[in-house]
């Protein structure tokens, strides 16, 4: 299953506390190792912002949850996604099924 993961940095305290949080984030991230069942397909940062997007393919939602729990200085949102052509195909199937229902 593919997941679109978005993140934003949580609000920090003073400028000094924020700088310390930035250092801690980088220290933790440097040590993180991507699990074998967690394939990163896209990993980008929003320009001029403290957040970004990751498209990951993973067969275990617990692994996705663990990733989101690794960096508590961020808020994460992980949403399962499907390719648009798959979505269009099943939507057309659903419409055809509904159109086949006879009204009374």
Which functions belong to the PLM regions below?
Residues 51-56:
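Short cationic amphipathic helices and targeting signals
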Residues 62-65, 79:
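A generic structural signal for well-ordered alpha-helical surface patches
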Residues 1-34, 39-42, 46-50, 61-62, ...:
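Short S/T/G/P-rich N-terminal loop/turn motif that feeds into the first structured element of a domain
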Residues 37, 72-75:
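Glycine-centered loop/turn motif at secondary-structure junctions
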Residues 57-58, 70:
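Conserved catalytic core of Hanks-type protein kinase domains
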Residues 64-72:
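Short amphipathic alpha-helices in soluble, non-transmembrane regions
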Residues 74-86:
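Conserved short beta-strand edge segments in small beta-sheet-based binding/regulatory domains
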